[in-house]
Amino acid sequence: TSGRPSPTEAAHVAEDLSGKIAMIIDGGPVGIGIESTIIDLTEDTPMVLRPGYITPQMLSKVLGKEVIIDPGIIAADDTRKPKAPGMKYKHYAPKADMVIVDGTRKHVIAKINELVASHRDDGKKIAVIATEETKQFYDADVVLSMGSRADEDSIAHELYRILRDCDELDVDVIFSESFSTPRIG
């Protein structure tokens, strides 16, 4: 269903579709944890309609030509509509407000701790999404680890599960380190 982070295990599907389906076959948690890549090959220039595990760079190597990303999903304004299904709704978004902080490790830790302190003063329940390497540096109500920064597969695998955990923990705001995962989109 739209408006929720994508399901990564049978319990998530049951929660999202309760009363709407008769049965769930549980094959275990997803292997990767992020959306599949959708690509349009109907034009001369291949276009990624929904970014996922397979990057435009990977596709370019296989196809032997440049692969572009649908301008409708990267446009700053709302004038261009995405071509792919599933890009219209905020199905990646947790219920809480979320801020992603980018920069050097030292800067990110300092900024997130500053944000945590200011929101704590407002009485908000706060989650921080970090890595194994940095989780000990945060003092939030909830600190969740995406795994090791060196393990892109783990980070991708944990993304939607952690966003759902934040929903279940009923946090008001989430501060997250940014994650560059060039190998997996």
Which residues does each predicted region cover?
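Active-site-adjacent structural elements in enzyme catalytic cores
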Residues: 1-185
